[in-house]
């Protein structure tokens, strides 16, 4: 009888610990407010600067490393948190006739991971992989 109670308590403790670990490791939902500021990342031959302002306006600057050529896009940003991974959407882009779509994952207050940008919703990546991930660091 005492042995069965001991096993019951041990099993219950293990279950509580596993639940605690799962809930603590869940990915935080990034909000535009938490992403406000300037972010810098490098991907392939590009240095990428993403600036998110408090009024949901944002700019994306792509600098091609060897030539120093710069492409800049200005628009409105939002995050769709209805599905995981979360989508970062840049709309009303002055320089383009289309929107830009990406995935976003907040690693901590100073690092975010984003996928390559796509001009079509159906063609944007569905997961973050080593090949398609841009690691942005907050510029302080």
Q: Which residues fall in each region the model found?
A:
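Positively charged n-region of N-terminal signal peptides that target proteins for export
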Residues: 1-7, 77
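Hydrophobic membrane-insertion alpha-helices, especially the h-region
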Residues: 8-21
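N-terminal helix-cap/turn-to-beta initiation motif at the start of protein domains
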Residues: 24-38, 51-53
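Contiguous, well-ordered beta-strand patches that form the walls/edges
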Residues: 44-47, 64-118
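Structural signal for glycine-centered tight turns and loop->strand junctions in beta-sheet-rich domains
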Residues: 54-58, 83
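Short, exposed beta-strand-loop hairpins at the edges of beta-sheets
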Residues: 113-130
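Short, solvent-exposed mixed-charge patches
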Residues: 139-140
